[in-house]
Amino acid sequence: VFISIPSEGADNLPYEKNGKETRCIVDEIPFEIPDSWEWVCLEQICIYIQRGKSPKYSPIKKYPVIAQKCNQWTGFSIEKAQFIAPETISSYSEERFMQDRDLLWNSTGLGTLGRMAIYRTELNPYGIAVADSHVTVIRPCSLVLPEFLFYYFANPTVQTVIEEQSDGSTKQKLSCIG
């Protein structure tokens, strides 16, 4: 996400320092925040940000795959999940297994791009779940409330930025934010 730690220049405008480069980011700050807050990079407040991977599907209902259809503005729902082939579960590293209160962010699809929900383990009777390649998992550090990030990303101003940053001929994929 664009959000970065700015510093103020002599002109009282916000600047971002990235390595050796410093640039004015006044046009990128979506809205004013209280003086006691600061803009930060999403990577600075999360321990994991990763798109899911393409699964090998199976009719065996053992390990659900969280897809965009499981991720609605009304919340997370396991009922629409498909399942991965049980023999492929070992190809997933432990951090790819969903954890309670992970943010599920639809990262492709016209009309679904940017949609977000919060994963709840109590809504998954199967125990283990993984995300497919159209869902990005955002796992905030313990000091950050996932609900705060959810409401930030759900904000119409931020959703507009996400739509404007979409990529490809059909504007169906988020290349980057920021």
What residue ranges belong to the model's regions?
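A short beta-sheet element
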Residues: 67, 89, 93-154, 168
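Extended, domain-scale alpha-helical bundle/helix-rich regions
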Residues: 1-22
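Short beta-strand/loop turn elements enriched in aromatics
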Residues: 57-77
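Short, basic/aromatic beta-hairpin or loop at an interaction surface
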Residues: 70-84, 127-129
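Non-catalytic DNA-recognition/assembly elements of restriction-modification systems
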Residues: 23-52
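Amphipathic alpha-helical segments
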Residues: 37-38, 149, 178
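Specificity-determining recognition surfaces
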Residues: 152-178
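Active-site/binding-pocket entry motifs
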Residues: 71-72, 110, 159
